[in-house]
Amino acid sequence: MSLSRVSVTAVRNLHPVTFSPSPRINLLYGANGSGKTSVLEAIHLLGLARSFRSARLLPVIQYEQLACTVFGQVELAQGGHSSLGISRDRQGEFQIRIDGQNARSAAQLAEILPLQLINPDSFRLLEGAPKIRRQFLDWGVFHVEPRFMSTWQRLQKALRQRNSWLRHGTLDAASQAAWDRELCQASAEIDEYRRAYIKALKPVFERTLGELLQLEGLTLSYYRGWDKDRELSEVLATALHRDQQMGHTQAGPQRADLRLRLGGHNAADILSRGQQKLVVCALRIAQGHLVSQARRGQCIYLVDDLPSELDEQHRRALCRLLEDLRCQVFITCVDHELLREGWQTETPVALFHVEQGRITQTHDHRE
């Protein structure tokens, strides 16, 4: 799948624009502060209903504008196309439209437009809190396991009920036992989906990383959020008094983590920033392969400031892997000459110059 048309209005410093990207490689170049990253942010907003630059969306809306909007036409893997639109106003109201109809949730956008982001903050996947790695893991499971979303919703509902009971004790024992059974059942299913996903991801990740970097002894493992040798029901019963003191459930899928270790140490403590970037790239490219293998289409990659922290050899290796995915890629850089060469002659490459919020196409992929 790919975006064949994108329209952006009132997103940060961008002037209103409609452009037609290449179905494969798109290079957006220009000086720092010109608006290149804002273009990626607009696409990210269209696919996930959130920004990767700010936890709050108010700063995304252009000064003195009432709302920001992004529209896109998606060419679907199975043929045909889908029209997506999202608008967010200063009062925090969202409107999501899919093929002219109001959509209920951002998950519907994500299913149609699977996005992968690689940017200068990507190292946080290794250095950041477990929540970031759970989001990475669950993004992958969501796109390959059709049962994941409904099970996840069951889990969240049961977890909210238990946490409320821990804080306020508002349920009778029989009702709480029923919610605990639901929590344990949904947790077991989520753990099963995650475990199967990691089993599929590991060999693809290792192969992909080998194309980018030689790191002997790097291991990827999955911690499910509670003792692997005990049932969750037993763990919850044992920890009940402490959970009541804390006011929340301390064991379960909401505590899961991915662990990358090198020589017995946390990999993030040993690897350079450039090496961390390549490890994260390998993880995200491996996810793209699994989406394709599941016949769910292809990911769209948003790569912000690709040349940073990478030498020419590693830049070329990363570009080759992205090209081999045969998916749509948007790459920002200051100097497009660093990335313009090296693509296969049959790969459509489009160039867009971004200057003071204006986007001008300087090379059409059809030429």
Curated annotation (Swiss-Prot):
Q: What is the lineage of its organism?
A: Bacteria, Pseudomonadati, Pseudomonadota, Gammaproteobacteria, Pseudomonadales
The GO biological-process annotations, alphabetized, read as:
DNA replication; DNA synthesis involved in DNA repair; double-strand break repair; SOS response
Family of the protein in this entry: Belongs to the RecF family.
Q: Provide this UniProt record's keywords sorted from A to Z.
A: ATP-binding, Cytoplasm, DNA damage, DNA repair, DNA replication, DNA-binding, Nucleotide-binding, SOS response
Per the record, GO CC terms?
Answer: cytoplasm
Q: Which domain of life is it from?
A: Bacteria
Query: What PROSITE patterns is this protein classified in?
Result: RECF_1, RECF_2
Q: Name one GO molecular function term.
A: ATP binding
Protein known as = DNA replication and repair protein RecF
Q: Indicate where this protein resides in the cell.
A: Cytoplasm
- Listed binding positions for ATP are 30-37
Q: Which residues form a coiled coil?
A: none
Please name the NCBIfam families in this protein's record.
Answer: recf (TIGR00611)
Q: Which Gene3D superfamilies match?
A: P-loop containing nucleotide triphosphate hydrolases, RecF/RecN/SMC, N-terminal domain
What does this protein's UniProt record list under function?
A: The RecF protein is involved in DNA metabolism; it is required for DNA replication and normal SOS inducibility. RecF binds preferentially to single-stranded, linear DNA. It also seems to bind ATP.
- Cysteines paired by S-S bonds: none
